[in-house]
């Protein structure tokens, strides 16, 4: 799925735009026991409660593609005949109305998910979307539809204890201590099937993880029985390892600054282009950056080999997963220097009297914790 397709579905999660008739789910305690079930008609729920359910489900389609939103790809064999795909299709085709199928799905989540000591809420909803046709100007015609997209969306939300506070009890006309449990934003979720080319793709699902460095592979194994792509954090670490191992002493400040600047430029250009497809960087593209910076051919070949070993042949990477384009950070054992990437060139490395130093020009005013200071010798 691309950004436009995700955004199109996100707009469904409003009271006047969806065809969700019921909300299903269950509340699970930290002993992995179902405490209660949810089976609510959206038509009779108070509007504020219905909107809260929709907002929680909508968050399962939030975040960045390739970071929080991850493509799950089923093999042809799985789609043809597998328990995991059959269950997902049954959820969708039954419109979640079959309680036995829902229970089987709940148990897959409960038996695999590790949220520590947290209680959590599993939410499920089914929607049917009359996909508007697009005219020759790429504009949607709300009155014309060629296809119906039937899908299931799920999210898993931690349920947290609220602090004990004073509250007013109208029946007693008094204030008393009160506490309770509140539903937090989803930790994970998914959409099935995927909405590719604005149509159902039963070979794919879209998985959501709030944390980009912890994508709950245990749930992906249980529900989808497939291996997810590397998380954004894993991609970044693998890329850094491939680079540092191949380059050795050649991995210096100037080279890393240049790589960061080139990748950041690509990210900015992609953002300005409004291209809905995720930005991709091939291993050859990354190797070309090294070549442009004068890295020896032998080291470039070693880098390519390392990347193929880490990511697989023909792999493409998302530059946004490899760097933090919003900052440039330099760390030592005892200090951290963080700069606007536009000014990363200000940091230099020098060896003075046998010791390594980081140098930053201080031509303007200098402050320490808000205090303006002068430099000795000025």
Question: Predicted segment positions?
Answer:
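Post-signal/leader-peptide non-cytosolic segments of secretory proteins
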Residues: 8-10
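Long, hydrophobic alpha/beta structural blocks
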Residues: 14-17, 21-324
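C-terminal, beta-strand-rich globular interaction domains
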Residues: 277, 286-378
């Amino acid at each position: 799925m691309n950004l436009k397709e995700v955004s199109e579905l996100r707009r469904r999660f409003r009271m006047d735009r969806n065809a969700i008739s019921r909300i299903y789910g269950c509340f699970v305690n930290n002993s992995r026991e179902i405490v209660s079930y949810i089976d609510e008609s959206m038509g009779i729920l108070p509007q504020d409660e219905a909107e809260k359910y929709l907002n929680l489900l909508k968050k399962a389609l939030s975040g960045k593609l390739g970071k929080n939103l991850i493509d799950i790809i089923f093999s042809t064999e799985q789609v043809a005949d597998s328990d995991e795909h059959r269950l997902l299709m049954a959820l969708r085709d039954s419109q979640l109305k079959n309680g036995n199928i829902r229970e089987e799905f709940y148990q897959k989540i409960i038996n695999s998910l590790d949220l520590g000591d947290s209680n959590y809420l599993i939410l499920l909803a089914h929607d049917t979307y009359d996909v508007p046709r697009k005219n020759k100007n790429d504009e949607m015609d709300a009155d014309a539809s060629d296809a119906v997209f039937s899908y299931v969306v799920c999210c898993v939300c931690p349920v947290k204890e609220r602090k004990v506070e004073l509250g007013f009890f109208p029946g007693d006309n008094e204030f008393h201590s009160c506490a309770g449990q509140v539903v937090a934003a989803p930790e994970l979720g998914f959409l099935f099937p995927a909405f590719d080319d604005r149509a159902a793709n039963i070979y794919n699902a879209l998985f959501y993880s709030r944390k980009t460095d912890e994508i709950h592979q245990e749930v992906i194994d249980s529900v989808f029985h497939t291996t997810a792509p590397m998380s954004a954090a894993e991609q970044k670490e693998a890329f850094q390892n491939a680079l540092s191992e191949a380059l050795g002493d050649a991995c210096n400040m100037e080279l890393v600054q240049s790589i960061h600047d080139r990748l950041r430029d690509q990210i900015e250009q992609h953002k300005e282009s409004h291209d809905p497809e995720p930005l991709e960087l091939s291993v050859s593209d990354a190797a070309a950056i090294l070549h442009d910076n004068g890295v020896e051919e032998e080291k470039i070949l070693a880098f390519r080999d390392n990347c193929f070993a880490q990511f697989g042949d023909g792999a493409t990477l998302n530059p946004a997963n490899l760097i933090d384009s919003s900052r440039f950070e330099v760390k030592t054992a005892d200090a951290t220097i963080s700069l606007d990437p536009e000014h990363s060139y200000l940091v230099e490395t020098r060896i003075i009297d046998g010791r390594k130093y980081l140098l930053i020009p201080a031509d303007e005013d200098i402050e320490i914790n808000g205090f303006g200071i002068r430099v000795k010798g000025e």
